[in-house]
A protein has these predicted regions:
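Terminal (and in a subset, N-terminal) low-complexity or junction segments at the ends
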Residues: 1-242
Length: 242
């Protein structure tokens, strides 16, 4: 097998969490000396595989052994830590990447904002995420994508700032909010038990995709969590399917 075949196999292992199979492939790569010949291709594939399987220690070891590290390798490692909500590690990697002369990419900021969201338990992280988001365009000259804006909605939503999140969606988005954005808002409403805003987000999700099963389930749960006063509306949520 060549480097591309190994990289595709590692991606498949990561997607299904088959870390044992991934380790066997890693051993084959080492035995054949392929990592030294295809440093970045296989290095990033290994980092992604280990990260998706939840073994950040192995991902870090692979990264440390890479002879050459470009922004893609840094992003792969940062993404792994972000998925686990390791904000301090993500910030360290982000700063180290800058110090080593690599400018952050679009993916770098997705990881940074996601890490802020997953670790969000106080207003300070909302401020940190907002600073990072604004720095994209003002300092790094990167135009935020829909994914970055949705990350900010997730951050505000997890922090309980639902009104601010809705205001951002309806007044500040430079493009039309998509299904993912409204679903993110709906999930935040479920977390905080906000029935009115939840229904608002739910209706927008249905306008974009009326077969979104997850949205129906989430809205029903919002009503159920609201206990007796809203239980009669559970049937209403189901009626949207008709």
């Amino acid at each position: 097998p060549d480097a591309i075949t190994y990289a595709c196999s590692l991606k498949a292992c990561g997607n299904i969490g088959a870390i044992d199979k991934g380790r066997k492939i890693h051993l084959e790569i080492d035995r054949n000396g392929l990592l030294s010949k295809h440093n970045l291709t296989l290095g990033c594939a290994l980092i992604n595989m280990y990260s998706k399987c939840g073994s950040l220690a192995d991902a870090q070891i692979v990264f440390t052994k890479l002879r050459i590290r470009d922004v893609i390798a840094w992003d792969a490692l940062m993404t792994g830590y972000a998925q686990m909500g390791k904000l301090k590690d993500v910030l360290y990697i982000f700063k180290k990447m800058n110090a080593d002369g690599h400018r952050p990419s679009v993916i770098s900021f997705v990881s940074l904002l996601n890490a802020c969201s997953h670790a969000c338990s106080h207003v300070g992280l909302v401020e940190a995420g907002t600073i990072a988001f604004n720095a994209m365009s003002t300092f790094y000259f990167i135009t935020p994508t829909m994914e970055h804006y949705t990350c900010m909605i997730d951050l505000l939503g997890r922090a309980g700032q639902l009104d601010h999140a809705l205001m951002a969606i309806e007044d500040k988005f430079p493009f039309h909010p998509d299904n993912v954005t409204w679903s993110t808002m709906l999930s935040a409403c479920r977390k905080w038990g906000n029935v009115d805003l939840g229904k608002h987000a739910f209706q927008h999700v249905l306008q974009l995709n009326d077969k979104e099963d997850g949205a129906y389930t989430c809205m029903c749960n919002i009503y159920i969590d609201a206990k007796g006063s809203q239980c009669k509306h559970v049937e209403e949520a189901h009626l949207y399917r008709l």
